Amino acid sequence: MSPLECSECFGDQLLHRTYTWHLTLHSRPNFTRKRDTRSESLEIPINVVLPQRGTAEPFLRLHNLYPTPRCARQAALPRLSRRVVSQHSYPLNRFSSVPLDPMERPTSQADLELDYNPPRVQLSDEMFVFQDGRWVSENCRLQSPYFSPSSSFHHKLHHKRLAKECLLQENKTLREENRALREENRMLRKENKILQVFWEEHQAALGRDDSRASSPLLHKDNASSLEAMKKETALQAHRGRENSTLQLLREENRALQQLLEQRKAYWAQPDEKAASTEEIKPISSPHEEPHGLLPDPGPGLPSPFEEPKGLPAPPDDSKTLRALREMVSTLSAQPGEEVGKGGPGLPDGSQSLELLREMNQALQALREENQSLQVLRDENRLLQEENRALHALREEHRLFQEENKALWENNKLKLQQKLVIDTVTEVTARMEMLIEELYAFMPAKSKDPKKPSRV
């Protein structure tokens, strides 16, 4: 039964719903003839089929216009003389208006030029079309009711399936390749994070070394800033050294002042004794003492020229203290000369003070030179350690890059090998299928394989 014969015959299908309109065409009376006022009408039933979910767009059906019904159900239905419209009518937007002549014979589908689309349903990956009272796959759709499928159709279907399988296999390989690339990117991100941590630690170490001492070999761009920092540190160290030197000089001056006070007190005692015994003689000044007034003291008495024990002496200035003791011993070895000279004794004390200061300055200069040499040695040692660490890091980074390159090439070769294996497997499967098809077309006798004759 053709889809154009009767739409009521398809009412039992669950995949569409049918709405019917009865279109009546009236012809005007012919006024050319006298008293001929008859009007003729033609009733055309039109069906609109609304597909359910999963089907194509709505389509139009047209009833049979022949006088005799071509379907048993259509013959059993009563004919309506007027237009019947369903409660749930659908707009007739697929109907193409064509001038119809009611005097002619009933027109066909080609004469009406109606746009007809058969119903379609898509299930999984296949499309089904309703044709000749049954649902048929779109790939297996018949062109006419007398069409008989041939082997070429199945061959085409088989090729389509093979193409679909090839596409699925290719998609699978692409997904695997994408997975491998994602894994490789994840590993590279981890390696970059590790290298970044190493680089940050190295930069922090370089910053600490720069704060200690400048490194012109590694930081040529920051030479000016490092020089300024070095100058500031040198100025601070020099100021600290000057402060320590001033402190030492103050302590030495304090010790010398105490020594002079002790000498003055010791010289004043014999003057008082001489004044009490000999009142006639004038009181001599402490600077005009006789030569025999300063004998060597006893073994239990301390010498007035010895350095007091309570004086603070830094442990690092042993040479300075030794020189000071030598100067004090030289001063104590010449007491008679100072007494004989009398008045010029004080200038000699100032000269000894000046000599001590000069010696202290020379010792401070030597100590500063030694400290600067020690600082330079420490800087050189730190620079050598930094160079060794940098060389080790560069070597490790180079080995790491070579290892990454080898891993990447290995992964690439594995992917290529897998693609080749898949291609060979696919070609082998196709060859087997072709051999089976050839055996299917061959007669029964030739199906038995024969051994090839030896030449």
Curated annotation (Swiss-Prot):
Coiled coil, from the record: 160-197, 240-266, 350-421
Biased composition (Basic and acidic residues): 270-291
The entry's keywords: Coiled coil, Phosphoprotein
Modified-residue entries (Phosphoserine), positions: S41, S86, S89, S97, S124, S144, S148, S150, S211, S225, S276, S332
Origin superkingdom: Eukaryota
InterPro entries for this protein: Chibby_fam
Keyword Phosphoprotein belongs to the record: yes
Annotated family: Belongs to the chibby family. SPERT subfamily.
Listed PANTHER family: LEUCINE-RICH PROTEIN, PROTEIN CHIBBY HOMOLOG 2
The name this protein goes by in its record: Protein chibby homolog 2
The encoding gene: CBY2
